[in-house]
Amino acid sequence: MHSTGYCQAVEKAGGIEVPRRARYIRTIILELERIQSHLLWLGIAAHIIGFDTVLMQAWRIREPVMWLCEKITGNRKLYGINVVGGVRRDIPKAMHPELMGVLGRIERETKAVLDAVVTDTTLLARLANVGVLPNKDAIAYSLLGPTARGSGVAIDIRVDHPYAAYGEVETNVMVETSEDIWARTVVRIKETLDSIRIIRDCLAMMPEGPIQAKITEPIPPGRIGQSSVEAPRGETHHYVITGEDNRPYRWKARAPTFQNLQGVPIMVLGETIADVPIALGSIDPCFSCTERLETVDVRSGEVKVYTKADLFRLCKERWSKR
């Protein structure tokens, strides 16, 4: 997700046209990432509420997806598939039947999970009417991804501002309106199934041609490029200013967790302590994406923002004085 966002920002800054085939391959990898991420989340969420049977089943279904990622890119994670101007590796037609077979198996098993989720009384008791995030608050706090869509907000960068091959391949925005953890769960499972369909469509519609643009000149300094990508957790935005020697002068990324955390206090208000972990977990937080902390001195009113590096430095300094 992040490499796509970064590359697209640089490509916009440099006026680089990515070949259509490369855009289709990017879309396939992005949707494989969405599938494995949602299944990973489903297992962790089930573990949080003590339902380890779902954890084991979700991660069992996820494993062939990881195998597909490795088959295509050479890596289970940190795929390294994107380069500025295209992709590093192709998906030849000879690989298509194998991919389609694995996708069919994943689809059947994910449908079984969806059927279980919507009817299982234990899951409904723990997830329905828990961690409620009203639609108006999801809009007011500009929440993103499944967190927003579970509260009835039809927002999805793939549809609102298409990139890669999403302007050519049908993409459905999965929305639920019960505004609770159950809704966020159903949104993710339905998105998993739609991602499988998107990959199939990409394989069927993939055009012939090169997978990398011919870039013959350095990108001039002072150019600005921005790009948004619909990550599994929601919109990820990248901002790039080009510098000298074909290097970035400034690069800023905003991950969706930073925005979605704003909704957690509303979700947990009035809930039991036992429901706080799953309410927080329902946004699929990535705390390494939000490594900053704001503190307010209650005596002076002074406000300070600390990064992860600042906090580690202060921690080491304190212990070195003991």
Predicted regions and their residues:
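Active-site bordering "gate/hinge" segments
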Residues: M1-R322
